[in-house]
C-alpha cells in the first residue's frame, strides 16, 4: 500500500474481517507506521523509510521467513469475523483449558494493578463486593489485604473456583474471600452485595455479551451500589496507546472482544442504567472506571 486507501478497501484486499482490520490498524497507528484520517489510512514517513521495497533501508528481509501458508492460516483462523475463538469458546462451554497455567497467567496479569487500585478511598465506602469472572480472586485478594472490612465473593467457572482457594490461603485472606463456582452468563447472580467488579473481563467478549454482563451487574445491586471496571483503555481516536493496542490484537487471536475507549465503556454503563461513570484512578495502562446505580430503573441511551 503505497498510496492512502479506504479502510474498507484495505480490508477487502487483505481478505480479513472488519474487527481484525480495526485491531491491526490500531496497533500500526500506535507504532507510528500508519496515519488514519476519517475512513482512509496511509503510510507514515517512518513506514515509507523502512517498509517500501524501493527504500535503501527496506526491512522486508526480516519477514521473508514467514511462509504464505502461515499467513494464509493466520488469515483463515484468526482474522475473519465470526470465527470461533479458542478461549472464549471453551469458557462458554463451561470448560477452562489448562486451568493451572491460566490461573497463574491471570494472577500475574492482574495483581499489581489490583493492589494499587485497592488503595483508592472509594473502597472504604463499600462492604460486600461480587467479583464477576474473577478467576482465582487476584483482585479480591488485593482488596481484602488493603481493606480489612471488605468481604468479597469471586464468581467464575467451577474449574477456576476449585483452584482459587490456594491463592487466598497463600495471602492469608481465606476468611474474607469466598468463591462461587458458576457460569456468569447463564446463572442467576447472588444477592446481598453493594458493589460489582469486572476486572479484565469485558475485553474478552463481544458487544452483546458486554451489555449482558453490565445489565446483570445493574440488577444485582441496590440503589446506591457501585460498579468497578478495570481495563486498559484505548485513546478516543483508537490510535493508541501501544500497550492497549497490542493487547487488543491479542484478544483478536483468542477471544471475541477488544479493548474499549472510555466513551465506549461509559456508553455501555449508561445503557444498563449506571450513572456518573469516571476513570477514577490509573496504574500504567490500566484505568479503574467507577459508576453508580442511582435509580432502580435504567434510563440509559442506546449505544448500538
What does each of the following model-derived ranges do?
Residues 1-30, 35-36, 123, 128-304:
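Alpha-helical subdomain
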Residues 2-5, 12-13, 18-127:
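Conserved Class I S-adenosyl-L-methionine-dependent methyltransferase catalytic core
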Amino acid at each position: 500500500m503505497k498510496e492512502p486507501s479506504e479502510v474498507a478497501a484495505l480490508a477487502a484486499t487483505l481478505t480479513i474481517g472488519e474487527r481484525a482490520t480495526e485491531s491491526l490498524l490500531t496497533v500500526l497507528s500506535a507504532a507510528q507506521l500508519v496515519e488514519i484520517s476519517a475512513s482512509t489510512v496511509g503510510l507514515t514517513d517512518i513506514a515509507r523509510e523502512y517498509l517500501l521495497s524501493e527504500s535503501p533501508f527496506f526491512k522486508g528481509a526480516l519477514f521473508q521467513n514467514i511462509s504464505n501458508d502461515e499467513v494464509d492460516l493466520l488469515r483463515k483462523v484468526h482474522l475473519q469475523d465470526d470465527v470461533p475463538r479458542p478461549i472464549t469458546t471453551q469458557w462458554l462451554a463451561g470448560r477452562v483449558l489448562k486451568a493451572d497455567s491460566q490461573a497463574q497467567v491471570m494472577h500475574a496479569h492482574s495483581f499489581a494493578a489490583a493492589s494499587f487500585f485497592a488503595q483508592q478511598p472509594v473502597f472504604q465506602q463499600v462492604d460486600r463486593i461480587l467479583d464477576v469472572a474473577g478467576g482465582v480472586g487476584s483482585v479480591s485478594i488485593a482488596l481484602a489485604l488493603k481493606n480489612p472490612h471488605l468481604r468479597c465473593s469471586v464468581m467464575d467457572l467451577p474449574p477456576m473456583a476449585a483452584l482459587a482457594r490456594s491463592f487466598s490461603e497463600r495471602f492469608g485472606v481465606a476468611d474474607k474471600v469466598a468463591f462461587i463456582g458458576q457460569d456468569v452468563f447463564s446463572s442467576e447472580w447472588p444477592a446481598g452485595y453493594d458493589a460489582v467488579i469486572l476486572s479484565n473481563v469485558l475485553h474478552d467478549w463481544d458487544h452483546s455479551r458486554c451489555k449482558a454482563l453490565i445489565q446483570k451487574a445493574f440488577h444485582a445491586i441496590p440503589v446506591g451500589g457501585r460498579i468497578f471496571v478495570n481495563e486498559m483503555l484505548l485513546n478516543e481516536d483508537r490510535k493508541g496507546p501501544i500497550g492497549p493496542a497490542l493487547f487488543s490484537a491479542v484478544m483478536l487471536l483468542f477471544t471475541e472482544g477488544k479493548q474499549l475507549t472510555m466513551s465506549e465503556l461509559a456508553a455501555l454503563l449508561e445503557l444498563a442504567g449506571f450513572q456518573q461513570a469516571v476513570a477514577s484512578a490509573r496504574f500504567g495502562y490500566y484505568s479503574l472506571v467507577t459508576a453508580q446505580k442511582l435509580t432502580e430503573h435504567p434510563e440509559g441511551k442506546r449505544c448500538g
